Amino acid sequence: MVGDEAHQFKSKSLVSIMSKLSDAKYRFGFTGTLDGTQTHKWVLEGLFGASYKIIKTDELMKKGHLAKLNINILLLKHSPNKFETFEDEIQYIIGHNRRNNFIKNLALDLKGNTLILYARVEGHGQPLFDLINNNKSDDRQVFFIHGGVETENREKVREIAESENNAIIVASYGTFSTGINIKNLHNVIFASPSKSRIRNL
C-alpha cells in the first residue's frame, strides 16, 4: 500500500480502508506536512508504521527542489464588527470590496508569478479572478483554477507557471495547496482565512 499525501489518511473512509488491509505486506505513506499534533502522528503511524523524517524543507529549498520562502504579513485594518457566527465573519471578509481591491492591486503590482489562494469558488474565487483579469495588462496571463477544472488543465497551468515569469494563478485551496510544487513561484497571497497548518504549508 502506498499513500501519497498521507496526512489526509486521518479521514474515516481512508482509516476504514487501511484497517481492512491486514494482509498488506508493505505500507508506505508519504507527506511533507503533518498537522503538528501528536494524535495525527499516532494515527498515521498506526496505519503505516513508524515515521521517518528523510529531509527538511529548508534542505529541499537549498537543493532547488522547492521554491524559497520569505513571509511578509500585510495587516489590513477593518472597522470593529461583532458577528453572530463564523460564517457571518467569513462572508464579511470575502465580500469586502476594499479588501478584494487591495488583493487585486497587490497581485497586479507584484513582479513574478503570483498564486492567489481562496476557499469559495463562487463567493470569492470567481469575483477575484474577474477583478484581476479585467484590470491586467495585455501581456499578463491570469488563470482560474477550481475543482471543476480538469486535472490535465491544472497541470498545464502549473507547467506554464514554470516557464512564465509574470503569470497570476487564482486557485482554490483544494486544488493548489498541498501536493503542488511550482519552483518558479515568486508570490503567494492567502486571500481567504485559514488556520489549517497543512493547508498553509
Predicted feature descriptions by range:
Residues 34-35, 195-201:
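Conserved SF2 helicase motif VI
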Residues 19-24, 38, 65-67, 107-109, ...:
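Conserved catalytic network of the ASCE P-loop NTPase/AAA+ motor domain
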Residues 1, 5-7, 176, 193-194:
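Conserved Walker B
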Residues 81-119, 123-134:
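Conserved interdomain hinge at the start of the Helicase C-terminal
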Residues 170-171, 178-193:
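A short beta-strand element within the Helicase C-terminal
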Residues 5, 30-34, 119-121, 171-174:
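A short beta-strand-to-loop transition that corresponds to the Sensor-1 phosphate-sensing loop
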Residues 2, 7-70:
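Post-DEXD/H (motif II) to motif III coupling segment of the RecA-like Helicase ATP-binding lobe
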Residues 115, 126-127, 139-177:
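Conserved helicase ATPase core of P-loop NTP-dependent helicases/translocases
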